[in-house]
């Protein structure tokens, strides 16, 4: 017997979303490490319709004096959406959102890095969104962590990010672009998976305390699943 699920059922079922996923299901994910020869570290990530390339350069001596810290390195992140990454072609160059996400990304990654080993140095992380389909800030953080590990930067742990949110009064994991547009709330989270220390936590929208707790638990669980893909990418890269 073949069961046919209609579009109306997809929209109203608590366990099936418009793209066919369960409420606690991630989009398909692929990560590769070390794909750029001239970067010190690099990664490529596909997460649903997102395609993101990350290059890491450094640590290297900070040429600008105001960037120098006598006791540690400085991490700089540049998040950029390519003009062709979205349906409505965007203007080249950083906009307000890109600047904000660049800052948030650096803050999320910093706790994992042993920066005191490289005083007066800078580590540059370039995140290029080639195609965007919702959740690019979390995907960028996840890919950047792999690229930093590929660069050999000493790390206390990886950083992995994922979001949960509320769509149609249902708390769901890993919002797609359409769900993000139509949804009632979004909770991006980044953690150090070994200790589950939170390095990024944002909340946009309306959630009850119980819904927020559920969203946070779902996002952390999503992070732990994504971390397995991070580890596999590095194992393939280094044959371990």
Curated annotation (Swiss-Prot):
- Give the UniProt keywords, A-Z: Cytoplasm, Exonuclease, Exosome, Hydrolase, Nuclease
BP GO annotations: gene expression; rRNA catabolic process
Q: Which domain of life is it from?
A: Archaea
**Where located?**
Cytoplasm
Kindly report the protein's main subcellular placement as a broad class.
Answer: cytoplasm
Report the GO terms under cellular component. cytoplasmic exosome (RNase complex)
Function of the molecule: Catalytic component of the exosome, which is a complex involved in RNA degradation. Has 3'->5' exoribonuclease activity. Can also synthesize heteromeric RNA-tails.
Name the protein family: Belongs to the RNase PH family. Rrp41 subfamily.
The annotated subunit structure for this chain is: Component of the archaeal exosome complex. Forms a hexameric ring-like arrangement composed of 3 Rrp41-Rrp42 heterodimers. The hexameric ring associates with a trimer of Rrp4 and/or Csl4 subunits.
The protein depicted here goes by the name Exosome complex component Rrp41
């Amino acid at each position: 017997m073949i069961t046919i699920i209609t579009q109306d059922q997809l929209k109203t079922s608590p366990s099936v979303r418009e793209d066919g996923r369960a409420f606690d299901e991630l989009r398909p994910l692929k990560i590769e490490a070390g794909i750029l020869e001239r970067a010190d570290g690099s990664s490529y990530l596909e997460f649903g319709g997102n395609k993101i390339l990350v290059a890491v350069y450094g640590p290297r001596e900070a040429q600008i004096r105001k960037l120098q810290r006598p006791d540690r390195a400085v991490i700089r992140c540049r998040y950029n959406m390519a003009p062709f990454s979205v349906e409505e072609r965007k203007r080249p160059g950083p906009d307000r959102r890109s600047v904000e996400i660049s800052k948030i990304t650096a803050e999320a990654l910093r706790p994992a890095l042993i920066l005191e080993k490289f005083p007066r140095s800078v580590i540059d992380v370039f995140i290029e969104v080639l195609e965007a389909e919702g959740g690019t800030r979390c995907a960028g953080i996840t890919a950047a962590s792999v690229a930093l590990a590929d660069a050999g930067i000493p790390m206390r742990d990886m950083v992995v990010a994922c979001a949960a949110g509320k769509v149609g009064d249902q708390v769901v994991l890993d919002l797609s672009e359409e769900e993000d547009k139509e949804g009632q709330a979004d909770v991006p989270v980044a953690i150090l998976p070994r200790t589950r220390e939170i390095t990024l936590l944002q909340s946009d929208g309306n959630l009850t305390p119980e819904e927020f707790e559920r969203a946070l638990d779902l996002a952390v669980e999503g992070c732990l699943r994504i971390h397995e893909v991070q580890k596999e990418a590095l194992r393939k890269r280094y044959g371990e």
